[in-house]
């Protein structure tokens, strides 16, 4: 039995999962549910562009709206390569220049080992899950 599909439409097979959007959780926090490459690179690129614009606006004195902090949900990330690590560092730097914070959460043991080996555990803030990360972000913004 063939699956139902509209006439003239072929089945679409995806090699990779669809890119997960970056969700605006509140006026001050956005949550990125990251996947493996190539989605990881696309999402990190989107965050980098956002924070670059915010940093440029801040530098030029045009910071009308408050820059959103970011929670990077890495629950679906199964590996990190050197390019991914460079993207994490770039987003962190740009967020800092824009006056925002970045928090990583839901890290698997395998990814945690990579973060420890590269000393990124000393640079980033971490939370166990998204809910804890959001609570920590709200407390940080409250100061």
Predicted regions and their residues:
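Amphipathic, Lys/Arg-enriched alpha-helical "gate/interface" segment within cytosolic domains
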Residues: 69-71, 79, 83-131, 135, ...
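Residue-level signal for alpha-helix termini/capping positions
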Residues: 52-59, 63, 93-96, 138
